[in-house]
Amino acid sequence: MNIQIEVLGEVTCVRLEGRLDFGAATGFQQSIERLFAGKPPPPAVIIDGSRLEYVASAGLRAFLLAAKAAQRAGSAFALCALQPAVREVFDLSGFSQIMSIHPDLDTARARVRAPHK
């Protein structure tokens, strides 16, 4: 899996490409931990799933840990542009009920607001 991180103003975009399976979940989780370990942490993080082909249960766990890390840091957290198969996994697992998911990056950027500490 390929992970690219880009700062777009106050929003940090994490672009995922490939398969977020058991082997890739650890690398994704470590990237997110490094991101939130920065001082100061980013005000908002959006995970762009437009090129994410597959997510396993270990990947869902990594998303949950990322959302919790964002909450601890006082950062907004959202996902966008999930492929239909990936979105179905989020829907069936109930993750779409607990995470902010937007149809595209522009919509996510417009709706994400950093929570006040």
Stretches found by the model and what they are:
Residues M1-R15:
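Short beta-strand/loop segment at the start of cytosolic alpha/beta domains
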Residues E10, F95-I98, D104:
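Glycine-centered tight turns that cap/initiate beta-strands
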Residues F22-M99:
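Amphipathic alpha-helical interaction surfaces in cytosolic regulatory modules
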Residues L8-G9, S50, L82, D106:
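Conserved catalytic submotifs in the C-terminal HATPase_c
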Residues Q4-E6, C80, H102:
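General small-molecule cofactor/ligand-binding pocket signal
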Residues S100-K117:
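A charged, well-structured terminal subsegment
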